[in-house]
Design a protein with these regions (language model features):
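Short, leucine-enriched amphipathic alpha-helices that occur as contiguous helical runs
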Residues: 3, 7, 11-15
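Helix-turn-helix
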Residues: 9, 17, 21-51, 55-63
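Short, residue-level hotspots on alpha-helical faces of the histone-fold
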Residues: 55, 59, 118, 122, ...
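Residue-level detector of well-ordered alpha-helical segments, enriched
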Residues: 56, 85, 89, 93, ...
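A short secondary-structure junction motif
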Residues: 63-67, 71, 119, 123-126, ...
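Hydrophobic alpha-helical connector segments
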Residues: 70-109, 162
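Amphipathic alpha-helical packing segments from all-alpha helical-bundle domains
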Residues: 88, 107-114, 121-150
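C-terminal peripheral helix-coil segments that are non-catalytic and often amphipathic
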Residues: 96-99, 103, 133-236
Length: 236
């Protein structure tokens, strides 16, 4: 019982400090002080800071990913011989995350939003294995579902576009999205669920957009000339 309490205190302290300072900016000394434990406890329960980060992500990601897979399974079962609509696949991916947040207190939602933003700002080599471990299989299932729903597109195109989906989702629920940075055009006062619905419509259209035989749309000569001029100016 005491061991479980120590473990939970370390996880809670890690969430708070990682959200405030980032993973690389948080020391073991700060973690042990915030959790009121000794250094040996970190190594005993997690093996070190990397193991602690892994447990922090696992605690939040596992229930959400299980719900995502359940929803996708139900979609595919209901579709029978057909394929679920792109919008429904996106909903199955997005909504479990939203429901996870809705079950939390506002302070925890803010904490988890900042934590997610902090983790994604870590060096890629520091988080690639972590993301692959906790989200790789789930994302693969959704990419495969989208590939079947978008059979007219090459698989590599769908792969790339799903990465755009992930990036857009991350930005839409980061603190920076709500900054009023466009004079005269304030941020829409919509609920998280409404924002998700807007996102789904927007992203489904992007996923369905046609591509050339090379996997990209043809760009007008004017745009090519302009982009070339921009690159030349940037090199000066």
């Amino acid at each position: 019982m005491a061991g479980e309490d120590t473990r939970e205190r370390l996880l809670n302290a890690a969430e708070q400090l990682f959200a405030e300072h980032g993973v690389s900016g948080t020391t073991l000394r700060a973690l042990t002080k915030a959790a009121n434990v000794n250094l040996a406890a970190v190594h005993y329960h997690f093996g070190g800071k990397e193991g602690l980060l892994d447990a922090v992500v696992e605690r939040r990601a596992t229930p959400m990913n299980q719900e995502r897979l359940r929803e996708l399974y139900e979609l595919e079962r209901s579709a029978g011989e057909g394929t679920p609509a792109v919008e429904d696949i996106l909903s199955a991916f997005f909504l479990p995350g939203l429901r996870t947040f809705e079950r939390e207190e506002p302070e925890t939602i803010d904490l988890l939003t900042r934590l997610s933003a902090r983790i994604t700002c870590e060096p890629p080599e520091a988080i690639e294995a972590l993301v692959r471990k906790h989200f790789g299989m789930v994302m693969r299932r959704f990419v495969e579902a989208l590939q079947r729903a978008l059979g007219e597109l090459r698989k590599e195109v769908v792969n790339d576009r799903f990465r755009f989906v992930i990036g857009t989702l991350s930005h839409a629920f980061s603190g920076t999205f709500d900054l009023d940075v466009i004079p005269g055009h304030p941020v829409c006062d919509s609920s998280d669920e409404e924002r998700i619905q807007h996102l789904i419509v927007f992203l489904a259209a992007g996923l369905r957009a046609p591509s050339s035989s090379h996997g990209v749309l043809e760009v007008s000569p004017v745009a090519v000339r302009r982009s070339g001029g921009i690159r030349k100016e940037a090199r000066r």
